[in-house]
Protein backbone atom coordinates (compact mmCIF):
# COMPACT_ATOMS: atom_id res chain seq x y z
CA UNK A 1 0.00 0.00 0.00
CA UNK A 2 1.23 3.50 -0.88
CA UNK A 3 2.19 5.31 2.35
CA UNK A 4 0.00 8.25 1.37
CA UNK A 5 -3.04 6.06 0.72
CA UNK A 6 -5.72 5.29 3.27
CA UNK A 7 -7.68 2.86 1.10
CA UNK A 8 -6.64 0.98 -2.00
CA UNK A 9 -7.94 -1.51 -4.55
CA UNK A 10 -5.32 -3.35 -6.59
CA UNK A 11 -6.30 -5.17 -9.80
CA UNK A 12 -9.72 -6.01 -8.37
CA UNK A 13 -12.13 -8.22 -10.31
CA UNK A 14 -15.72 -8.88 -9.26
CA UNK A 15 -18.52 -10.75 -11.02
CA UNK A 16 -22.16 -11.26 -10.16
CA UNK A 17 -23.13 -14.30 -12.20
CA UNK A 18 -22.29 -13.42 -15.80
CA UNK A 19 -22.14 -9.69 -15.08
CA UNK A 20 -18.67 -8.19 -14.76
CA UNK A 21 -18.89 -5.47 -12.10
CA UNK A 22 -15.17 -4.73 -11.74
CA UNK A 23 -12.56 -5.61 -14.35
CA UNK A 24 -9.08 -5.13 -12.93
CA UNK A 25 -9.87 -1.91 -11.07
CA UNK A 26 -7.06 0.04 -9.43
CA UNK A 27 -8.23 2.84 -7.15
CA UNK A 28 -6.83 4.59 -4.09
CA UNK A 29 -7.85 7.31 -1.67
CA UNK A 30 -4.93 9.46 -0.59
CA UNK A 31 -4.47 11.11 2.77
CA UNK A 32 -6.08 14.55 3.05
CA UNK A 33 -7.91 14.51 -0.28
CA UNK A 34 -11.50 14.58 -1.46
CA UNK A 35 -11.69 12.04 -4.28
CA UNK A 36 -14.76 12.19 -6.52
CA UNK A 37 -15.51 8.93 -8.34
CA UNK A 38 -17.55 9.44 -11.49
CA UNK A 39 -19.12 6.89 -13.79
CA UNK A 40 -22.37 6.05 -15.54
CA UNK A 41 -24.94 3.78 -13.90
CA UNK A 42 -23.53 0.27 -13.67
CA UNK A 43 -19.92 1.45 -13.86
CA UNK A 44 -19.02 -0.35 -10.62
CA UNK A 45 -18.77 2.58 -8.21
CA UNK A 46 -20.90 1.09 -5.43
CA UNK A 47 -19.25 -2.32 -5.83
CA UNK A 48 -15.82 -0.70 -5.50
CA UNK A 49 -16.84 1.06 -2.29
CA UNK A 50 -18.35 -2.14 -0.89
CA UNK A 51 -15.08 -4.00 -1.45
CA UNK A 52 -13.03 -1.19 0.10
CA UNK A 53 -15.32 -1.39 3.14
CA UNK A 54 -15.06 -5.17 3.39
CA UNK A 55 -18.78 -5.64 2.68
CA UNK A 56 -17.89 -7.67 -0.41
CA UNK A 57 -14.82 -9.76 -1.20
CA UNK A 58 -13.06 -9.47 -4.57
CA UNK A 59 -12.90 -12.50 -6.84
CA UNK A 60 -9.33 -11.49 -7.70
CA UNK A 61 -7.03 -8.71 -6.56
CA UNK A 62 -6.73 -7.12 -3.15
CA UNK A 63 -8.22 -4.39 -0.98
CA UNK A 64 -6.61 -2.58 1.95
CA UNK A 65 -7.87 -0.05 4.48
CA UNK A 66 -5.33 1.88 6.57
CA UNK A 67 -2.80 -0.76 5.52
CA UNK A 68 -4.95 -3.58 6.93
CA UNK A 69 -7.66 -5.92 5.77
CA UNK A 70 -10.98 -4.07 5.40
CA UNK A 71 -12.48 -6.59 7.83
CA UNK A 72 -10.22 -5.47 10.69
CA UNK A 73 -12.07 -3.69 13.49
CA UNK A 74 -9.19 -1.24 14.00
CA UNK A 75 -9.58 -0.08 10.41
CA UNK A 76 -13.36 0.15 10.52
CA UNK A 77 -13.34 2.31 13.65
CA UNK A 78 -11.66 5.05 11.61
CA UNK A 79 -14.44 5.15 9.00
CA UNK A 80 -17.63 7.04 8.37
CA UNK A 81 -19.99 5.62 5.74
CA UNK A 82 -23.12 6.77 3.94
CA UNK A 83 -24.31 4.31 1.29
CA UNK A 84 -27.12 4.80 -1.21
CA UNK A 85 -29.48 2.43 0.57
CA UNK A 86 -29.67 2.88 4.33
CA UNK A 87 -32.05 1.32 6.84
CA UNK A 88 -32.37 2.96 10.26
CA UNK A 89 -34.89 2.25 13.01
CA UNK A 90 -37.88 4.47 12.14
CA UNK A 91 -39.02 5.04 15.72
CA UNK A 92 -35.70 6.46 17.00
CA UNK A 93 -35.21 10.20 16.89
CA UNK A 94 -32.35 11.67 14.86
CA UNK A 95 -30.42 12.71 18.00
CA UNK A 96 -30.81 9.18 19.39
CA UNK A 97 -29.43 7.65 16.20
CA UNK A 98 -26.41 9.95 16.29
CA UNK A 99 -25.70 9.19 19.96
CA UNK A 100 -26.03 5.45 19.37
CA UNK A 101 -23.60 5.37 16.45
CA UNK A 102 -21.20 7.80 18.16
CA UNK A 103 -20.95 5.39 21.12
CA UNK A 104 -19.11 2.88 18.89
CA UNK A 105 -16.20 5.29 18.27
CA UNK A 106 -13.25 6.14 20.55
CA UNK A 107 -13.32 9.93 20.06
CA UNK A 108 -16.66 10.94 18.53
CA UNK A 109 -18.26 14.31 18.02
CA UNK A 110 -21.13 15.07 20.34
CA UNK A 111 -24.58 14.83 18.80
CA UNK A 112 -24.81 18.62 19.01
CA UNK A 113 -21.49 19.05 17.18
CA UNK A 114 -22.53 16.63 14.42
CA UNK A 115 -25.87 18.37 13.96
CA UNK A 116 -24.24 21.81 14.01
CA UNK A 117 -21.77 20.83 11.30
CA UNK A 118 -24.49 19.31 9.10
CA UNK A 119 -27.15 21.91 10.00
CA UNK A 120 -29.63 19.23 11.08
CA UNK A 121 -30.56 20.59 14.52
CA UNK A 122 -34.15 21.14 13.38
CA UNK A 123 -34.41 17.36 12.84
CA UNK A 124 -32.97 16.40 16.25
CA UNK A 125 -36.19 15.37 17.99
CA UNK A 126 -38.01 13.99 14.98
CA UNK A 127 -38.47 10.22 14.52
CA UNK A 128 -36.39 9.04 11.58
CA UNK A 129 -39.39 7.32 10.00
CA UNK A 130 -41.29 10.63 9.83
CA UNK A 131 -38.62 12.40 7.75
CA UNK A 132 -38.85 13.12 4.03
CA UNK A 133 -36.39 11.44 1.67
CA UNK A 134 -34.11 14.48 1.59
CA UNK A 135 -34.24 14.89 5.36
CA UNK A 136 -33.29 11.23 5.80
CA UNK A 137 -30.20 11.82 3.66
CA UNK A 138 -29.28 14.80 5.83
CA UNK A 139 -29.71 12.72 8.99
CA UNK A 140 -27.64 9.89 7.49
CA UNK A 141 -24.87 12.38 6.77
CA UNK A 142 -24.84 13.58 10.39
CA UNK A 143 -24.64 9.95 11.54
CA UNK A 144 -21.81 9.20 9.07
CA UNK A 145 -19.57 11.97 10.42
CA UNK A 146 -20.31 11.63 14.13
CA UNK A 147 -17.34 9.30 14.75
CA UNK A 148 -14.86 11.96 13.63
CA UNK A 149 -13.76 9.66 10.77
CA UNK A 150 -10.31 9.76 9.24
CA UNK A 151 -11.86 8.42 6.03
CA UNK A 152 -15.43 9.11 4.94
CA UNK A 153 -17.22 7.14 2.19
CA UNK A 154 -20.24 8.86 0.63
CA UNK A 155 -22.15 7.05 -2.12
CA UNK A 156 -24.35 9.54 -4.03
CA UNK A 157 -24.96 11.55 -0.83
CA UNK A 158 -26.82 14.50 -2.37
CA UNK A 159 -29.39 12.57 -4.43
CA UNK A 160 -32.83 13.78 -3.38
CA UNK A 161 -31.57 16.99 -1.78
CA UNK A 162 -32.69 20.44 -2.89
CA UNK A 163 -30.07 22.99 -3.92
CA UNK A 164 -29.82 24.61 -0.49
CA UNK A 165 -29.35 21.26 1.26
CA UNK A 166 -26.73 20.23 -1.30
CA UNK A 167 -24.78 23.44 -0.75
CA UNK A 168 -24.99 22.91 3.02
CA UNK A 169 -23.50 19.44 2.59
CA UNK A 170 -20.77 20.79 0.30
CA UNK A 171 -19.82 23.32 2.98
CA UNK A 172 -19.68 20.57 5.61
CA UNK A 173 -17.48 18.41 3.37
CA UNK A 174 -15.00 21.26 2.89
CA UNK A 175 -14.93 21.75 6.66
CA UNK A 176 -14.27 18.04 7.24
CA UNK A 177 -11.32 18.06 4.82
CA UNK A 178 -9.97 21.17 6.56
CA UNK A 179 -10.20 19.24 9.85
CA UNK A 180 -8.11 16.40 8.42
CA UNK A 181 -10.63 13.89 7.06
CA UNK A 182 -10.17 12.21 3.69
CA UNK A 183 -13.30 11.63 1.60
CA UNK A 184 -14.35 9.35 -1.23
CA UNK A 185 -17.47 10.70 -2.89
CA UNK A 186 -19.45 9.18 -5.74
CA UNK A 187 -21.79 11.54 -7.53
CA UNK A 188 -23.91 12.02 -10.64
CA UNK A 189 -23.63 15.80 -10.28
CA UNK A 190 -20.58 16.84 -12.29
CA UNK A 191 -20.68 20.36 -10.85
CA UNK A 192 -20.34 18.74 -7.42
CA UNK A 193 -17.10 17.06 -8.43
CA UNK A 194 -15.91 20.22 -10.17
CA UNK A 195 -16.57 22.31 -7.06
CA UNK A 196 -15.30 19.94 -4.36
CA UNK A 197 -12.79 17.41 -5.64
CA UNK A 198 -9.04 17.53 -5.21
CA UNK A 199 -8.91 14.58 -7.57
CA UNK A 200 -11.40 12.88 -9.89
CA UNK A 201 -11.44 9.20 -10.90
CA UNK A 202 -13.55 8.19 -13.91
CA UNK A 203 -14.79 4.58 -13.95
CA UNK A 204 -16.59 2.83 -16.79
CA UNK A 205 -17.43 -0.87 -17.16
CA UNK A 206 -15.54 -1.69 -13.99
CA UNK A 207 -12.27 -0.14 -15.15
CA UNK A 208 -10.46 3.04 -14.22
CA UNK A 209 -10.42 5.22 -17.33
CA UNK A 210 -8.31 7.98 -15.81
CA UNK A 211 -7.72 9.97 -12.63
CA UNK A 212 -6.33 13.41 -11.92
CA UNK A 213 -7.30 16.93 -10.97
CA UNK A 214 -10.31 18.48 -12.69
CA UNK A 215 -7.96 20.47 -14.93
CA UNK A 216 -5.99 17.33 -15.81
CA UNK A 217 -9.21 15.50 -16.71
CA UNK A 218 -10.33 18.41 -18.89
CA UNK A 219 -7.00 18.30 -20.72
CA UNK A 220 -7.81 14.80 -22.00
CA UNK A 221 -10.43 16.14 -24.38
CA UNK A 222 -10.13 18.26 -27.49
CA UNK A 223 -13.62 19.70 -27.23
CA UNK A 224 -14.17 23.39 -26.64
CA UNK A 225 -17.26 25.43 -25.90
CA UNK A 226 -18.00 28.40 -28.15
CA UNK A 227 -20.58 31.08 -27.37
CA UNK A 228 -21.68 33.81 -29.76
CA UNK A 229 -24.53 35.90 -31.11
CA UNK A 230 -25.13 34.93 -34.71
CA UNK A 231 -27.73 35.16 -37.45
CA UNK A 232 -26.99 31.54 -38.38
CA UNK A 233 -29.52 28.93 -37.31
CA UNK A 234 -28.88 26.01 -34.98
CA UNK A 235 -29.55 23.65 -37.90
CA UNK A 236 -26.90 25.31 -40.09
CA UNK A 237 -24.20 25.10 -37.44
CA UNK A 238 -25.14 21.58 -36.31
CA UNK A 239 -24.48 20.38 -39.87
CA UNK A 240 -20.80 21.32 -39.68
CA UNK A 241 -18.65 18.19 -39.20
CA UNK A 242 -16.64 19.59 -36.26
CA UNK A 243 -19.75 20.44 -34.23
CA UNK A 244 -21.04 17.99 -31.63
CA UNK A 245 -24.04 19.94 -30.37
CA UNK A 246 -25.61 23.39 -30.43
CA UNK A 247 -28.08 24.96 -28.01
CA UNK A 248 -29.61 28.41 -27.60
CA UNK A 249 -29.23 30.28 -24.32
CA UNK A 250 -31.21 33.51 -24.42
CA UNK A 251 -29.66 35.60 -27.24
CA UNK A 252 -26.56 33.42 -27.63
CA UNK A 253 -25.76 30.07 -29.20
CA UNK A 254 -23.59 27.64 -27.25
CA UNK A 255 -21.57 25.29 -29.45
CA UNK A 256 -19.55 22.27 -28.31
CA UNK A 257 -17.03 21.31 -30.97
CA UNK A 258 -13.88 19.43 -31.80
CA UNK A 259 -11.56 21.60 -33.86
CA UNK A 260 -12.85 24.87 -32.46
CA UNK A 261 -10.51 26.89 -34.68
CA UNK A 262 -12.24 25.58 -37.82
CA UNK A 263 -15.66 26.38 -36.35
CA UNK A 264 -14.60 29.93 -35.48
CA UNK A 265 -13.30 30.44 -39.03
CA UNK A 266 -16.61 29.18 -40.44
CA UNK A 267 -18.59 31.48 -38.16
CA UNK A 268 -16.55 34.53 -39.16
CA UNK A 269 -16.80 33.67 -42.85
CA UNK A 270 -20.53 32.89 -42.76
CA UNK A 271 -21.89 35.73 -40.62
CA UNK A 272 -20.73 39.32 -40.93
CA UNK A 273 -22.97 40.27 -37.98
CA UNK A 274 -21.29 37.82 -35.57
CA UNK A 275 -20.96 39.26 -32.04
CA UNK A 276 -19.83 38.30 -28.52
CA UNK A 277 -17.63 35.44 -29.70
CA UNK A 278 -15.95 33.54 -26.86
CA UNK A 279 -14.11 30.22 -26.80
CA UNK A 280 -13.77 28.22 -23.58
CA UNK A 281 -12.04 24.95 -22.83
CA UNK A 282 -14.19 21.89 -22.25
CA UNK A 283 -15.85 21.44 -18.89
CA UNK A 284 -15.83 18.29 -16.81
CA UNK A 285 -19.10 17.21 -18.43
CA UNK A 286 -17.52 17.03 -21.89
CA UNK A 287 -14.45 15.25 -20.52
CA UNK A 288 -16.62 12.71 -18.70
CA UNK A 289 -18.65 12.01 -21.86
CA UNK A 290 -15.57 11.47 -24.00
CA UNK A 291 -13.77 9.28 -21.49
CA UNK A 292 -16.74 7.00 -20.83
CA UNK A 293 -17.37 6.64 -24.58
CA UNK A 294 -13.97 4.96 -24.83
CA UNK A 295 -15.26 2.08 -22.70
CA UNK A 296 -18.42 1.55 -24.75
List the predicted regions and their residue ranges:
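Alpha-helix C-terminal capping segments
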Residues: 65, 70-71, 98-105, 118-120, ...
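ABC transporter nucleotide-binding domain
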Residues: 170-258
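A generic structural signal for alpha->beta connector loops
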Residues: 108, 180, 243, 271-274
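Solvent-exposed beta-strand sheet faces enriched in polar/charged residues
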Residues: 10, 229, 249, 278-280
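C-terminal coupling/interaction segments
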Residues: 258-296
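ABC transporter nucleotide-binding domains
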Residues: 4-7, 14-185, 190-204, 210
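Short, flexible helix/strand-to-coil boundary loops that buttress conserved ligand/catalytic motifs
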Residues: 92, 221, 241, 267, ...
Amino acid sequence: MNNGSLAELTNVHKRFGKTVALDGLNLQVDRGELLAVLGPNGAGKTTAISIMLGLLKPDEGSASLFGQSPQECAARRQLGVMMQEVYLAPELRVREHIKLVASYYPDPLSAEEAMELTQTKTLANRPYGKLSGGQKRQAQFAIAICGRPKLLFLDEPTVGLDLQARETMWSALRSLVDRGSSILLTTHYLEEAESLADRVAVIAKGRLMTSGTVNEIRAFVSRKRITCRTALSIEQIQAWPEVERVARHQQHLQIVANGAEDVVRRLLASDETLEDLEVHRAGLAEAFTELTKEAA
